[in-house]
A protein has these predicted regions:
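Conserved Walker
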Residues: 45-48, 81-96, 111, 119-128
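AAA+/P-loop NTPase substrate/partner-engagement loops
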Residues: 17-58, 62-69
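Conserved AAA+/SF3 P-loop NTPase catalytic/coupling segment centered on the Walker-B
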Residues: 53-79, 93-96, 103-114, 130-131
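A short helix-turn-beta junction within AAA+ P-loop NTPase domains corresponding to the substrate/partner-engaging
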Residues: 112-146
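AAA+/SF3 P-loop NTPase mechanochemical coupling elements
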Residues: 49-53, 85-103, 133, 345-349
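C-terminal helical "lid" subdomain and adjoining coupling/linker elements of P-loop NTPases
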Residues: 150-151, 177-252, 256-258, 262-277, ...
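P-loop NTPase catalytic core of nucleic-acid-dependent motor ATPases
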Residues: 1-27
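Conserved P-loop NTPase/AAA+ ATPase motor core
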Residues: 263-353
Length: 353
């Protein structure tokens, strides 16, 4: 039941405070600097490190995360995937979840245009797709309001020690199969995506409906937010790793109506491949196979401007096959234009593609 979470956002939203104060079973590693011996296993005195002593290990200020050992990140990747690590001759199991919190110093729009939402991480982690793919969830810290005096309630609440111990006891249970009664996940989710989403469904259900009694619509809301949080990770992996992570169109299907619902992330814009309504003049969408043989959606744009009758191609780069197809298509059109009177008036104009 290990869980790997990332939350990056503006300052003063309580990111560090939660992991430092809300539970006696979590520890906040300030500054991010640590060693393999401190975090995992000390070979000299044969003692397990922080992951064996705490339920949650949170790294504050991800930009400063640094291992003094060269193999630190590799060991962390293995632990994040399986909840186990090897030191010496032994393989050691631990139950601590990994949390990474930090600040974003630019707007989300700027990050999406210039780099990725994992940009605050050090380069050896923020560009390592194997490490980032092990992140189950990315909480959008920019959507969380900053704390102010009126953010706190005057009503009664649980003492944090009681609440944390109650939630700790619930770790023994799993609600990840509750969704199977009403929904099933789409085929764009691979095994790692499915594990991440099911972990989140179980966690949200424990927080909101700890008795496990949840209606279909209540569960639908949990499924959608879980898909969004995992898709945010996958969208950034696609930016960093390219088409290896092409399958980002996360969805779920209603078992009663068989209707498939797609879930997008707000900062990426619309969740539909083709926008609703009429296309702009000169635009058309089509489905075709790319060079790899994979089906994809393509948008073709054309524009006619006064010219000298020559054919000019733009926007297709150095793709030789695409150039050849455009050339042959125009030659065919040029050879067949005479029977069509409507084309006569346009012949002395330049076509841009």
């Amino acid at each position: 039941n290990n869980f790997n979470l990332c939350e990056l956002g503006p300052r003063s939203t309580g990111k560090s405070y939660i992991y430092e104060q809300i539970s006696p079973n979590s520890i906040l590693v300030a500054g991010g600097q640590t060693t393999v011996a401190n975090l995992f296993y000390n070979m000299s005195n044969h003692t397990v490190g922080l992951v064996g002593m705490w339920d949650c290990v949170a790294f504050d200020e991800v930009a400063g995360i640094k291992f003094k050992d060269k193999d630190g990140i590799q060991i962390m990747k293995g632990y994040m995937a399986s909840g186990a690590f090897s030191r010496g001759k032994a393989e050691i199991q631990a139950k601590a979840s990994m949390v990474f919190v930090g600040n974003i110093n630019q707007s989300v729009d700027t990050l999406l245009k210039t780099s990725s939402l994992f940009d605050p991480f050090p380069p050896e982690m923020g560009t390592d797709t194997a490490f980032l793919d092990r992140m189950h969830c990315y909480i959008p810290g920019w959507e969380i309001p900053k704390y102010r005096p009126d953010s706190f309630t005057n009503d009664y609440g649980f003492i944090t020690d009681y609440l944390s111990e109650f939630m700790r006891e619930l770790r023994k249970d799993s609600y990840s199969d509750l969704m199977d009664k009403y929904f099933r996940l789409g085929n764009n989710l691979n095994q790692r995506d499915t594990i991440a989403v099911r972990k989140m469904i179980s966690g949200f259900t424990k927080l909101l409906y700890p008795d496990g009694e949840v209606t279909k619509e209540e569960l639908r809301e949990i499924v959608e937010i879980s898909l969004e949080l995992r898709r945010r990770v996958k969208e950034q992996l696609k930016k960093i790793g390219g088409m290896e992570f092409y399958d980002v169109n996360f969805s779920y299907t209603d078992n009663d109506s068989f209707e498939e619902h797609y879930v997008s992330v707000p900062e990426q814009g619309g969740g539909k491949l083709i926008p609703e309504g009429m296309c702009n003049p000169g635009q058309i969408y089509t489905v075709s196979q790319g060079k790899s043989g994979m089906l994809g959606v393509f948008r073709l744009e054309s524009q006619m401007l006064p010219g000298n009758g020559k054919f000019k191609r733009t926007g297709i780069g150095s793709d030789r096959d695409a150039k050849k197809i455009h050339k042959y298509s125009f030659q065919l059109l040029e050879s067949k234009w005479k029977p069509y009177q409507w084309f006569y008036n346009y012949y002395n104009e330049r076509l841009y593609y």
